[in-house]
């Protein structure tokens, strides 16, 4: 039963990460799996589950604060291209994304669809 609960938790983490960020599902899945594994190991060794939960919540709050305080706005077309290129693993895709964002603006929407046309 614990394995099924853990699997459902990891699945939910991946889905929520994809819904919110659209990226990072692998990292979120690995972190969730490690938290579940270590949490169960600690509970089996006698740790208080509520204490573990509170500790995890405090850690999440601290990590979130640290990430937000070190975050930088991406404003220029060049910064967008560089960031998107790193995320896509392909600078030409980053350049296309920056071009599309330049055309639609900050509040615009860009829809990407798979095509059956090769090379276009």
Curated annotation (Swiss-Prot):
GO cellular component: cytoplasm
Domain of life: Bacteria
Binding site for ATP: 23-27
EC number: 5.6.1.7
One matching Pfam family: Cpn60_TCP1
Matches recorded under SUPFAM superfamilies: GroEL equatorial domain-like
Localization of this protein: Cytoplasm
Gene3D superfamilies associated with the record: GroEL-like equatorial domain (1.10.560.10), TCP-1-like chaperonin intermediate domain (3.30.260.10)
Catalytic activity: ATP + H2O + a folded polypeptide = ADP + phosphate + an unfolded polypeptide
GO molecular function annotations of the record: ATP binding; ATP-dependent protein folding chaperone; isomerase activity
Chain's role: Together with its co-chaperonin GroES, plays an essential role in assisting protein folding. The GroEL-GroES system forms a nano-cage that allows encapsulation of the non-native substrate proteins and provides a physical environment optimized to promote and accelerate protein folding.
Family statement drawn from the similarity comment of this UniProt entry: Belongs to the chaperonin (HSP60) family.
Protein name, UniProt field: Chaperonin GroEL
Species in which this protein is naturally found: Mycobacterium asiaticum
Underlying gene: groEL
